[in-house]
Amino acid sequence: MSDIAKLLGDEADKLLKHECRGIPKARLHLPGPDFVDRVVASSDRKPAVLRNLAALFNHGRLAGSGYLSLLPVDQGVEHSAGASFAPNPDFFDPGHIVRLAIEGGCNGVASTLGVLGAVSRKYAHKIPFVVKFNHNEFLSYPNTYDQTLFADVEQAFEMGACAVGATVYFGSAESRRQIWEVSQMFKRAHELGMATILWCYLRNNAFKQGDTDYHVSADMSGQANHLGVTIEA
């Protein structure tokens, strides 16, 4: 802790000793060993979904803590794989990505249909898979903040995935279509017994006004998270 305080410098006391007085801690649904039972079990999710959630929460170094550490890799789709992996070309191999998650003690590995599908028979029983079924891509010009379906839920189910994942760019011109698409995919995933994970991003150039970037405001990012939970992420 003393090393952390040194790194934080003059901001150490403000950051390490801050206590929120607006909403008491006791009113928050905080992570814990009983998170699935305490928070999720009373929802309308099927027992198979709860089982797969428990598989995620009880795997890796953080098993039983209520926290998740996922290795997310979408390089090659939303980022140039060459720019990302050139310093370590081994990671062009999907097997190396999954092994990194295993050796790092992650709760699971989240990646594309292609990456996880290429090695599913070898690794799906060794670490929970999260198949991300929509992506942006930046070969199209001008670039747009949109998410396109790259896979369907049945493909993730057949390869043995515990969960599916998606992104919605809340606030973008395409966000309402994205919300509908992801909502329908999550519904199908729950029917098949898989958990659902959503990356809730704010994307709108109008959210930047002068030197202020409202993308990072607690109220707007909290609204994005609330919309994500509304479609049962």
Predicted regions and their residues:
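N-terminal amphipathic alpha-helix/helix-capping segment at the start of soluble metabolic enzymes
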Residues: 1-79, 84, 117-126
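Alpha/beta enzyme core
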Residues: 23-30, 63, 75-233
